[in-house]
Amino acid sequence: MALNAKDDFDPVTLEIFWSRLISIADESAAALLRTSFSTIVRESNDFGTVLMDANGDSLSENTGGIPSFSGILPTTLKHFLAKYPKETWKPGDCVITNDPWLATGHLPDITMSMPIFRNDKLVGFSGSIAHSPDIGGSLWSADCRELYEEGLRIPPIKFLVEGEPNQDVEDMILGNVRLPDQVLGDLNAQVTANKVCGRRLVEFLDDSELDDLTRLSTDLQGRAEQAMRNAIEEVPDGAYHATLDADGFDEDETHIECTVTVKGSNLKIDYAGTSKQINRGLNTVMNYTHAYSAYPVKCALDPYTPRNEGSYRPIEVVAPEGSILNPRYPAPCNARQLTGHLLAGVIYGALVQAVPEKVIADSGSAPSMRAVFSGVNPMGNRFTQILFASGGMGACPAKDGLATTAFPTNAGAGSIEAFESVAPLIVWKKELRVDSGGAGAFRGGLGQECEIEVRSEDELQLSLLSDRWRHPALGVLGGLPGAPSQIRFSDGTVPHQKSRTSISPGARLHMVYAGGGGYGDPKDRDPARVRDDVKNGYVSAAAAKRDYGVS
């Protein structure tokens, strides 16, 4: 171990230690992935793992985890510590919650944390969050009118007590869900992940001859904070304003007002003027609002420094209490991603006025659309299966947007084979959508088309979580908007975009996903790239002539 005169770690040692802490979070994530039961975790990547110091501040997160999870988990741990002070934790304890106001903003996400001891001294905490395959109540949906309809709410409570299951808590959870085996399997996978994280941290401290993480966490978080401050200082001081509208629920369209104020090395995001909270599940609690505000700033201004607690210290996020971005309890919030995922677009709409070379156009992948199917499969087993699929990312300042990429979330689509293996559903089509990317000097990412047939003997329940039907992803600096989303049945009927319904045997659901917005004037696009797009089937000949003037 190498220290300088100030008792700081030298840069080489710090980089080695930082990389190893990230690898610990990655190994924890691999354990969760490999031992989970549900496809939502092992196929769609809807989970995250975080290593935190003894104060509950984040040190490292798994590569490719859900961005909001790593941003929120330290906040949730501090709520755990408020109920269970540090001196009361014992080796093997595991505290759990899914309270939206304390954790990730909706009930399906379950947060767990365990203490890490070395030589009887508390040196840190491991944490994991995973989207449960079921949490009771309604299906994952947007049409509930208050939190109590949306499922089981678990207050902070010990799931394990000194390594032993708290059977009463386990029984309470499993007695309120449709898929108890899968739910318990995923909960145990989270416990396994947390234990792996703890073991590997102790090994790291032994190998590094460190008594604890105190100096290292101070140094790592300080470096991350300074990197973010340096990046913010490159943005001209000023207040930058943008708005964004979304479909909302029925007549309650969502309007987001955003002012990004930069002063020196500090950045403030203020959502004053945003729509009030509604009695449908689109409300986004402040934890989630903060996470999906800070993350796009990090992506734009300081994308390469690994994230930890220090990355967020220069960023302040405020939203009016009672707004859709800071609702009062017990507002419904089950589909909060349909609002929270939009924040990157409006933040970039503000920052493009100051640093156009650092931001992307609005993304059709935000918000991510979901279709939730539930019923009984031919073997007589209850199932709930979620189709994860994405629209296109917004175009970049010097690059086309990525097709069908889940920005700002990292949830994956998963394989069709896995999707079909647990439910009486057949996917007949899953392909890129021609002409869906917004035209520009750099084209928006393509959306996709999916067609799914019900092969059960009985009706299934379907919950749709979608947006961008009326408000497509916007282009910037002369770029055109991407194509909007659309959902319909094979008989031509159009379902409610955010509600539950029954779907009959033999019915086919056709889902069309939005494209990303374009960046820059389409007439500035290299004609050779337009012709390549036509050749590859991304852009039709008619659109090439209409939007780009290329034939």
Feature annotation, model-predicted:
Residues A2-P91, D99-R118, L122-S551:
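Glycine/proline-enriched, intrinsically flexible loops and inter-domain linkers
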Residues C94:
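Glycine-rich phosphate-binding loop of nucleotide-binding enzymes
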